Curated annotation (Swiss-Prot):
This is Cbp/p300-interacting transactivator 2. Its main location: nucleus. Keywords: Activator, Developmental protein, Differentiation, Nucleus, Repressor, Transcription, Transcription regulation. Transcriptional coactivator or corepressor of the p300/CBP-mediated transcription complex. May be involved in sex determination, early gonad development, left-right patterning during embryogenesis and differentiation of the adrenal cortex. GO terms for cellular component: nucleus. The gene is cited2. It comes from the Eukaryota. One of its GO terms (biological process) is heart development. It comes from Xenopus tropicalis. Pfam families: CITED. Belongs to the CITED family. It is found in: Nucleus.
Amino acid sequence: MADHMMAMNHSRFQDGTNGLHHPAHRMGMGQFSNHHHHPQQHTFNSLMGEHMHYGPGNINANNSIRHAIVTGNVNGGHPNGSMAPASRFNSPFMGPVPNQGAQLTASMQLQKLNNQYFTHHPYPHNHYIPELHPANQINGTNQHFRDCNPKHSTGMPPSVSHVPAAMLPPSVIDTDFIDEEVLMSLVIEMGLDRIKELPELWLGQNEFDFMTDFVCKQQPNRVSC
């Protein structure tokens, strides 16, 4: 056993200080370039195990070797000839080439869908349409946000007191502004300024008082309301 291990180590370390420099060990083929070293490799694979072999090693960012363990039957260290190349050299860092093509196709399809969405929905995020806000037609269509400070605000509509009644929409209540002088002239003309106690102006108050007084007068034996 010791002789076989020494022969194996000699065959592995003859090309460098460690066995990682050997091309056959790096590729995980289980073969050596020289046919004289084939019996030592066969003995080494018999000692390693019967049900697993190591796939190709990969070097990560820390320059450390990582092997992917592939389960299966090992016949003298050589992988089965009927196995697929992807399963023979399986590695978590090396994906098959058809997957890259599928990812590229999926990316192109996603980009196409995004272009169609943005074509039909020009304002997908804030759902802001400048045509519905006439203030932006004066200040520019690129202004999509309003200033929070009313003193420096340019997107806010002007004050109602400075807008004539003709420019306001017809559906707005109290569009006709009444001057105080006109109102006082109407009060003087109707003589309301001489009346100290104005009558009840809300609807139903007089009728309610009449019914209450009538019921109380018709039934004097009862306590009046």
